[in-house]
Design a protein with these regions (language model features):
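Conserved active-site "lid/cap" helical segment
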Residues: 1-6, 10-13, 21, 87-96, ...
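Conserved catalytic cysteine-centered active-site region
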Residues: 1-40, 62, 76-83, 145-174, ...
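N-terminal extracellular/periplasmic Venus flytrap/periplasmic-binding protein-like
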Residues: 98-188, 192, 255, 260-262
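Condensing-enzyme catalytic core mediating Claisen C-C bond formation in acyl metabolism
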Residues: 90, 142-216, 220, 227, ...
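Flexible glycine-/small-residue-enriched beta->alpha junction loops
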Residues: 42-91
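Beta-strand segments within the central parallel beta-sheet cores of soluble alpha/beta enzyme folds
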Residues: 13-18, 43-49, 98-105, 122-127, ...
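Active-site-proximal alpha-helical scaffold in enzymes
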Residues: 1, 17-48, 89-118, 181-188, ...
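Active-site pocket-lining segment
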Residues: 84, 119-122, 202-271
Length: 319
């Protein structure tokens, strides 16, 4: 009912999309694809999440929601994302210090971007909420190093003895409330409505990967998108890779050979939070703001999702 609450005409239709963490990015991609196909003129693509209202895991309540065939394929069961983040850290041999250092970087960059007004231009104040509340400009490596591993589990210790238990609340994304929205329009609609376009969306990719490692789908999704766009990594000016956990982004960087000077340059979910269904729009806003500030042309946005899925989207800044 969000579009009715927003005051849009009753003649305007709406649909709910569920791709977990990538829901808003997928909504954006579907909207752009519909515009490119000529099916739509103007679309509002957005998402919302109130994580403070719903307890994590409350949708299952300890029951098997997947059925016998799923159990036959994965007899030991899937794992939650915290364990997947630990598996990623172990697989790529990412130590605790590197995880914490990346989290510290995120808070520092987010605070600096807010001070410059780069992120604030895309924030619409709702009541007294007019800035991202999760940014901790005063955090330190010492404080982060004192946090205990967040996902230690006796059953998982036995199942995965290779895990060194390095993932903490500090190097994981925050539980957050948030919403985001983007206006996507055809070239004809832009001219007719006298809008000023900021960017174009031209290439898209979705990939699936190991559902137990889960968070690594961003690697094949990135490669798939670049192949479709006939671009190289060096052609991309900036990347926005969702900071679900430090280990996820660091593994992506190591696997693809991308330097951190191009990645999440205005901070990410470790500092800004990760309201699941809304995060795609926040990534786009951060990426576009950074491209506008630096004069870059191409930005690539990618988001890991439940079940080993990931979205990737190519953004081209317009002058």
């Amino acid at each position: 009912q969000a579009w009715l609450a927003a005051g849009l005409p009753e003649s305007v239709p709406a649909v709910t999309i569920d791709r977990k963490c990538g829901s808003t990015q997928q909504a954006m991609d579907f909207a752009a694809q519909g515009v490119i196909a000529g099916a739509y003129d103007v679309v509002i693509a957005g998402g919302v999440e109130m994580m403070s209202r719903v307890a994590m895991g409350s949708n299952s309540m300890g029951k098997d929601n997947f059925g016998a065939l799923h159990c036959m394929r994965y007899p030991d069961g899937l794992v939650h994302q915290g364990i997947s983040a630990e598996l990623v850290a172990s697989h790529w041999d990412i130590d605790r210090q590197s995880l914490d250092a990346f989290a510290h970087r995120s808070h520092q960059l987010a605070a600096e971007a807010a001070a410059r007004g780069i992120t604030g231009r895309d924030i619409v104040a709702i009541g007294n909420a007019d800035s991202d509340e999760g940014v901790r400009a005063d955090t330190s490596l010492k404080k982060l190093s004192q946090l205990k591993p967040a996902f230690v589990n006796e059953k998982m210790i036995e199942r995965y003895p290779e895990i060194a238990w390095r993932v903490t609340a500090g190097n994981s994304s925050q539980v957050s409330d948030g919403a985001s929205a983007m206006l996507i329009a055809s070239e004809h609609a832009v001219e007719r409505l006298r809008l000023k376009p900021r960017a174009t969306l031209s290439h898209f990719a979705v990939a699936g990967d190991d559902p137990i490692m889960m968070l690594t789908g961003i690697i094949p999704a990135t490669r798939k998108l670049l192949a479709r766009a006939d671009l190289l990594l060096d052609d991309i000016d900036l990347f926005e890779v969702n900071e679900a956990f430090s280990s996820v982004v660091l593994a992506w960087m190591r696997e693809l050979g991308v330097g951190e000077n191009k990645v999440n340059v205005n901070g990410g979910a470790l500092a800004l939070g990760h309201p699941l269904g809304a995060s795609g729009g926040r990534l786009t806003a951060n990426l576009l703001g950074a491209l506008e500030e630096t004069g870059g042309r191409y930005g690539l946005q990618t988001m890991c999702e439940a079940g080993g899925m990931a979205n990737a989207t190519l953004i081209e800044r317009l002058d």
